[in-house]
Amino acid sequence: KNLASWRVNASNKHHALVVGLSDEEAIKNVMKSWNANRDLGTGMHKCFEQYLNDEPVAQEANFQAEMSQFHVAMDSLVGLTPVRTEMSVFANDAKGDAAVAGQIDLLMRDSEGGLHIVDYKRTPGDLSPNAHAFGKFFLDDLPLNDHHKYSLQLSLYALMFELQTGQPIVSTRLVQVHPDLDEVRIVPTTDLRGDARNLLEGAG
């Protein structure tokens, strides 16, 4: 189904990967692209983590555009100080087993001691609340776009962090970087902790 729509829609980001190819060749092309993007995202995250932990940034030469945008982002987060990178969070079910888990990219503290979550996204796409959702909705009739999906992700992280530490999260935001962007984008997420709490209760 997806392959057919990608082939006829020249504006789709997968169109060039599948048009004129057999299903097998098209799937192979798409998987190769997805894997490459995943690896680039992982490499970028590692560069940011190493920089924040005062370690040598081994792949900095391969991520010059991303690192440049990252420095601009960090400079713009005035009053926030990095506290912890790559922090695992989880919530247990009734049996005490981890039912939901995630990893906070960066935890920051403000001048009053409040804690904030920052999540890195390597994408040139629209991460605004009004981004196109192709007529799809979820939760309380919210557009099912990347902004709201990532907002739910970070709301879950915020709740799990509070469950683990007893400390509330003041805010969550996305730091969006990509070589195709003219500049870094810092996107405040939508607070979906009410929906996230319902999901955690359902999982527990």
Indicate residue ranges for each PLM-predicted region:
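Charged, glycine-rich intrinsically disordered N-terminal tails and low-complexity linkers that flank
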Residues: K1-G43
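Charged, low-complexity, helix/coiled-coil-prone segments
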Residues: L3-V19, A94-D105, D140-D141
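Glycine-rich, flexible loop segments associated with nucleotide phosphate handling
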Residues: D23, I27-N29, L139-Y150
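N-terminal start-of-chain detector that recognizes signal peptides
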Residues: V19-S22, V72-G79, N145-H148
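Metal-dependent nuclease catalytic regions and adjoining charged, substrate-binding loops involved
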Residues: P143-G204
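Catalytic cores of nuclease domains that cleave nucleic-acid phosphodiester backbones
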Residues: A26-L139
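A structural signal for alpha-helix termini and helix-coil/disorder junctions
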Residues: S5-N9, Q50-D54, S76, L163, ...
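Secondary-structure junction/capping motif
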Residues: K1, E60-Q64, P143-N145
